[in-house]
Regions:
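Alpha-helix boundary/capping detector
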Residues: 33, 96, 114, 118, ...
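Conserved beta-strand -> loop -> alpha-helix junction used to position metal-binding or nucleic-acid-contacting
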Residues: 79-125
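RNase H-like nuclease fold core
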Residues: 2-86, 90, 183, 204
Length: 240
């Protein structure tokens, strides 16, 4: 470990100069523990990470900042693929935005589980599983039919005895549906712009993050500045 630390002290991280071009970007943030993370912008066309910065939490201003830096250098954002975090569609509201199908399905599963107990949940999960092989018209129809059948159900309220306070009786099913409804305009962007070759997942950057964590976690005792040097070396040198 001491040898590794000494080597990192000697390393001067130099970012490779790449000629700016028009490309689809995948911006996202990954964390190493609760309050230390790295926000990364990956160029899909080049399969390279072009910009990154340390963060203590995921906030939209970081994405605004990263986008501006890249555009000031001459990079053109033709579209982005995001994980669905609220606020991301606003950062990139002037270009096509695709929400990752994997993350959308993960969100719905978080609310419904893999084996929903209610009939409403079971039917909604079946609709969700159609996402990767559906299109906007078909998926919208399926969601609309589900809402028509279960609208009263997801609006049912339970009142707390002796108070005026209440909560939605089937809150998790409701949340799963609202997530799909809210993100629907961004779930089939990749089909609307075939010429841009937009993927429907963030797999390219997810794979980069997995590789990064495998490497960094081996040296978990590193001081913060040394750890970031290692992160920069890995992010800047990766191509797959």
């Amino acid at each position: 470990m001491k040898w590794v630390r000494n080597q990192l002290e000697k390393v001067e991280v130099k970012k490779k100069e790449i000629t700016p071009c028009a490309t689809v970007f995948i911006p996202d943030t990954t964390f190493f523990g609760g309050t230390y993370g790295v926000c990364v912008f990956r160029a899909l066309l080049l399969k390279k990470n072009l910009w990154w910065t340390e963060v203590s939490k995921e906030i939209m201003v970081t994405y605004y900042y990263g986008r501006k830096i890249l555009e000031d250098k001459g990079w053109v954002f033709t579209a982005v693929v995001v994980d669905g975090r609220r606020g991301m569609t606003t950062v990139f509201k002037d270009i096509p935005v695709q929400i990752c199908h994997f993350h959308q399905m993960k969100t719905v599963t978080k609310y419904l589980t893999r084996r929903p107990e209610t009939l409403a949940g079971q039917e909604l999960r079946r609709i969700m599983l159609e996402l990767p092989r559906s299109n906007e018209e078909e998926f919208t129809k399926l969601l609309s039919e589900w809402k028509k059948d279960w609208n009263e159900y997801i609006h049912e309220k339970t009142y707390i005895t002796g108070t005026r306070r209440w909560y939605y009786t089937y809150k998790k099913v409701r949340s799963a549906y609202l997530s799909l409804e809210r993100n629907l305009p961004y779930l089939f962007t990749y089909q609307k712009y075939p010429e841009l070759n937009i993927p429907n997942t963030t797999n390219s950057l997810d794979g980069s993050f997995a590789h990064l964590k495998d490497k960094v976690n081996i040296h978990h005792g590193l001081r913060r500045d040394r750890r970031f040097k290692m992160i920069e070396e890995i992010l800047g040198g990766e191509e797959d």
